[in-house]
Amino acid sequence: HTAHFGAGTLDSSKMTFAADRLFSALAIEAKKMGKMEEFVSIAGQDEFVLTDAFPYQSGPFLPKPIGFPKFDQADLTTDVKEVRRQAKMAKKLQFIPLEKFDSYVNGTLFEDAEHGVTNIVTKNQPHVDGALYQVSTVRYRDDSSLYVIANESELLNELMASLQYTGIGGKRSSGYGQFDLTILDLPDSFNNRLTKVHQGPVMTLTTSLPVEK
């Protein structure tokens, strides 16, 4: 599958998308179905959950946590060049397999997995002479996909089923953003790590900012 998730311009595209993009797309589907009121009601409930999209390749990947691993503590046994190499490797890394997440936080580094290939496509604006423009797209590997976490809801399932044909992201009129929907239960190893109450560092899976109550 191929998609365009804009990063500010047509000639740039991200590998994944944030929850607000999906929420907007679901709202449009709900309006088309005449179920906007029901969707708004569900979205306003405390148990409503909708995360950003992340890669799935033989298992779920997580976003790289900010501030980890820590390279600011001097280790006299490590060469300065090696420290710089590790810092560069960590900077390039975008997503971490769930099973390697703890190891990464504790300082173990590894190469970033390839989930898709970014291409630049040149298109012509109809009925306008010489109006060429470029669109950046991401084509996902056959063994890669994207996943989101959401609370169980018949309406959400119905909206997502419809959205797979409408598509998500930019340039949908060109056929981008369509997908094959699969609904799965969260693995216990993942579900057990999700929490709303925790004394210690946590990482949000939805692009958001904290507020004081």
Feature map (PLM): residue ranges:
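Conserved active-site/ligand-binding neighborhood in enzyme cores
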Residues: H1-K213
